[in-house]
Amino acid sequence: MTSSSVRVRFCPSPTGIPHVGMVRTALFNWAYARHTGGTFVFRIEDTDAARDSEESYLALLDALRWLGLDWDEGPEVDGPYGPYRQSQRTEIYHDVVAKLLTAGEAYYAFSTPEEVEARHIAAGRNPKLGYDNFDRQLTDSQRAAYLAEGRKPVVRLRMPDTDLAWHDLVRGPTTFAAGSVPDFALTRATGDPLYTLVNPCDDALMKITHVLRGEDLLPSTPRQIALYQALMRIGIAERVPEFAHLPTVLGEGTKKLSKRDPQSNLFAHRDRGFIPEGLLNYLALLGWAIADDHDLFSLDEMVAAFDVADVNSNPARFDQKKADAINAEHIRMLDVADFTARLRAYLDTHGHQLALDDAAFAVAAELVQTRIVVLEDAWALLKFLNDDRYAIDPKAAAKELGPDAGPVLDAAIAALDGAADWTTADIEAALKTALIEGMALKPRKAFGPIRVAATGTTVSPPLFESLELLGRERSLGRLRSARDQVGSP
């Protein structure tokens, strides 16, 4: 097989909100396809009408587009093996089941769960062992009798009486002993196809060569290999694909990261202001590393280096602090104009308005770019520029606006009122002359009260630049208002 013939797939079910573990799987598949020059197939497994939703389907499209994980075949792109939504492929599955039955690879099974348990008990076995392959040996007359009773059979695959083994690209040689996996259902009693059928069936028909998926699906692999082998014998499949079972993503402690964990929600990270580059870099580290001493890399660098054989099989813990730190680095790496545009879009999306024209906003953005972890942090630093959101934090006032702040504010107001021009340089010169030289104050004592009076907090962008952005009138108005409150109960 040439590398360009590699075909991988990402095939989520449209239920709930996209999960970071799911996105990690999509990323590894996408990166492997791009690294090999192969094809990335996006397929929707929407055969569970009770749980699937159009809202979740659209959320999946939104997630992949936001992250920049483009697909070569799939919804809204199409391709030679469509349709790419399983709900639109029902007739294909019925045809495959019919061929499996005709070839003797599958059979109708009428046993109820209660009957299976009763047979296990009668034989002295654990009643929870699962299906016992009883219906394999039914005669035509027995099947006819069951049908006459009104029973609706499921269709089961006839499992081979040999070990099922494969070389997992992540976990190495893996074997399930003969007889350890019973004949499994391919359809419901209604005739509707089950995941156990449609997933391998679609992989075969779409000529998937490599299956990269979560470790939680490892137990289903022997069943799927058996089905691939049956599909090969009836001329539907060309091969059994290579398998790579990716390590579990853990949350707190040793528990698997679940949908109930806040950090599992992809859109929660986007809402906080993660940028795609930062989040993808961190998710790539959940099982893979570009180098032992190198955690920061671009998507292009990942594509150039990624080989699924290098993925570690050990569970990977989602560390929010490390994710934040990596995102902060990627924000710093952005071109200033790019960062400015992204910050503007983020603030607009979240209803955060600043009274700044484009030029002033660009200045403000550059001031905060190296001071934030996520885009959300920028609003906390810049909201003082919005009069409706400006307020002096009581803790900041208690720290910086005590009685001894009065003379400092008086001197600052006088100095700024006399500044010829309202530029950062003029503001800095006026305040340093009045407070550092004139009053012999240390910078913290000199500028702390001014920062709190102007921005409402002890943490802000650089003070002199902040005052220039705020403007002469608003800056002096806030300083005077704060001076009036100094020393009051």
UniProtKB/Swiss-Prot annotation:
Gene3D superfamilies: 1.10.10.350, Glutamate-tRNA synthetase, class I, anticodon-binding domain 1, Glutamyl-trna Synthetase, Domain 2, Glutamyl-tRNA Synthetase, Domain 3, HUPs. Pfam families: Anticodon_2, tRNA-synt_1c. One of its GO terms (cellular component) is cytosol. The keyword Cytoplasm applies. Belongs to the class-I aminoacyl-tRNA synthetase family. Glutamate--tRNA ligase type 1 subfamily. Monomer. This is Glutamate--tRNA ligase. It comes from Mycobacterium marinum (strain ATCC BAA-535 / M). The lineage of its organism: Bacteria, Bacillati, Actinomycetota, Actinomycetes, Mycobacteriales.
